[in-house]
Amino acid sequence: MEYRIEHDSMGEVKVPADKLWAAQTERSHENFRIGVGIETMPREITHAFGILKKAAAMANAELKPEKMTAEKLAVIEKACDEVISGTLNEHFPLVVWQTGSGTQSNMNANEVIANRANELAGKKLCHPNDDINMSQSSNDTFPTAMHISAVIAIEDKLLPAIELLISTFKRLEEENEGIVKSGRTHLQDATPIKFSQEISGWRSSLERDAELLRLAVKPLHELALGGTAVGTGLNAPKGFSELVAQKVELLTGKPFVTAPNKFHSLTSKDELVFAHGAIKATACDMMKIANDVRWLASGPRDGLGEIHIPENEPGSSIMPGKVNPTQCEAVTMVAVQVMGNDVAVGMAASQGNFELNVFMPVAAYNFLQSARLLAEAIVSFNNNCAVGITANKDKMYHNLHNSLMLVTALNPYIGYENAAKTAKKAFKDGISLKEACVELGFLTAEKFDEVFHPEQMV
């Protein structure tokens, strides 16, 4: 491998000749051999850095035109666009497990953008600190990258995934409107319910989750950029905070604004905790929905067997013909991961000592993993399971008419205690509710038929 010599305030460093990073990135790459190649700083953060660095250069060009010249701005913007598009991903090797402020990832962005800008200019025009990091600090750029990436992850990936599954459930509601089945509480038989009503519960849960996510994402539109080192805005020109937020809004098409209190935005991560709570709520509902689906599909002969789900792959290496609810299992595992991530995000957010939180990379890593995994799991569950759900009408009818909880319909006619006696006798003697009720003398056979209609109990 060929190397070139780069230097920083600590001296010279050998850097691979084909890489755009420089001394500070290389030092971090050498000093933090923790999860290398596996737990790399999320690409969403890298791309957010491209957005904020471009926005900062645009703002500096207006506020400091003598320093951020048109020549510099032109090549910096092009380099940032390559970062945003992912073209330069290979030049961002740093892991999550580094300094808790994300300083080295900020410098990774500064160095790559500067060196790429210099390549585009055909000369040494831009400096990582003096130009790319102008009017900024790692302490305000990393929180800004966290918020930009979190907003994009929720609004552009997770919410569309939820809406996709909602649309599938709406279709299934319409298709199964007339089917009545046994309801269940505590995993025990309960009074009847329409299958469409059961599906509507799933759909409504996801609609509420989407509503909560839209509420929770709003505070994430506030950006720390302009607070610089400790929130005072040292070395940033007057008006930079407001202008750079406008530029981020322009680049993303999302309503980003400057945070009203930079001392808060550097040290507190409460907005991230709040938003991740909404992600966790979605995960909880997906856990419930997926569990319902796999219970209802259990069998095919010895389980509930009330619905059919797509058969996507063989389920066992030893039992021929076995097909498992694999999409349900995948989404429930993702839900567990999200719940664990919620603990990590909360713990990390609590570590805002004095003027800066120094657990930001791990908070960002877990937050973005949750949003990404849950979105992809929901899409997979929708496309490979939910769209193919069909009702086993015969099994639903059989289970419904064998349910002892239909006795609830008799309460107005024979009273709660007599209805309970009827159910217990039917269960003990292995007879129908009608036979038990008549034998106990509570109703005649004719009166039972007159008042007992399971399909009307919904």
Each language-model region and where it sits:
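Conserved, well-structured ligand/cofactor-binding cores
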Residues: 1-458
